């Protein structure tokens, strides 16, 4: 060991930061008149809710991941029994004459799970919407974006279908029609979208929702030709998927 003090710097820095944050919170509680008064005034509850909201946003944007929920979902997972809605939206148990508001229980994955359940309920009556990959062009990019898109849409419980790619637009269009795609995801490199995406859109726009995987520089030109849907790493995944549910009548 060359520098013991230097090696402990990271732990000491974290410890100091935690202590400073804890002391700041302690003083804020004291300003409310103590912990009990802080509870009665809703100060503690507001702080907890603010933390929950920040975490909800991080989960929706996949900055915080739950494997199997908002990242790497099981494409074939099915719910085999009825579920109580209280799992996704806990009841408010605060009594009418209570002095202190009761906090609801919190689970980070709940919003994604509720969204997926909504698709499952719809699928039981109408069939599960198919999201079909339309890979074309650069092999590495189309495979990477198809994988990203499959993972993206499976989070909402859609049936995702991938394939090895197409040599022509007509070949891809035919496959989409044969698979009765509700959503078609164009998967390619940024540079190649301008060359085939408008043609694919024109031939499929009356049959399915057309989505571009990525956020290419040519997006303004593509939007001018009608391509308005894009999925990429900066999306709020939860809100995007809810939007596609609405478009499909779910």
Residue ranges: model-predicted function:
Residues 198-250:
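Peripheral docking tails and interdomain loops at the edges
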